[in-house]
């Protein structure tokens, strides 16, 4: 009635996330599309509008300095390995050129961040190959194909 529309934001690639977890999120998104369009004729403007009103994009989990995710041991270890970040004995990041390079690499959260060698920064338990395929499918608007990975 009021024309207010809630928008869910989806994030993939969290530490510990498995491919089945990602598929569960995709299934929920597709269910939302189904519910939003169930009484509408496919191919109509109304159907398209209702379908597009459901956010089908996903951001990549990004470890921003100072966040709880950034302070977790697996994330610190990955960033140390892939960006050369150093941490104090208390787990605080050392502000040096490696940190600067990492921060400068933080761009659009919809994109996969890569290290200086082009390797993806993947905090999840999803293989790099599958994560990159999933990210590509999302970018192409083919989110449902993730269910077949």
Label each residue range with its predicted role.
Residues 1-148:
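A structural motif corresponding to the C-terminal lobe/cap of the Radical SAM core domain
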């Amino acid at each position: 009635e009021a024309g207010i529309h809630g928008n869910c934001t989806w994030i993939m690639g969290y530490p510990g996330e498995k491919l089945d977890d990602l598929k569960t999120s995709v299934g929920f998104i597709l269910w939302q599309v189904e519910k939003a369009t169930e009484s509408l004729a496919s191919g109509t403007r109304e159907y398209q509008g209702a379908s597009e009103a459901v956010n089908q994009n996903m951001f990549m989990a990004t470890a921003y300095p100072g966040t709880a995710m950034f302070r977790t041991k697996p994330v610190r270890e990955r960033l140390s390995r892939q960006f050369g970040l150093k941490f104090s004995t208390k787990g605080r990041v050392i502000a040096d050129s490696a940190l600067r390079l990492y921060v400068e690499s933080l761009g659009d959260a919809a994109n996969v961040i890569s290290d200086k060698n082009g390797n993806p920064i993947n905090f999840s338990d999803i293989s790099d190959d599958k994560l990159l395929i999933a990210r590509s499918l999302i970018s192409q608007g083919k989110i449902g194909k993730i269910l077949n990975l």
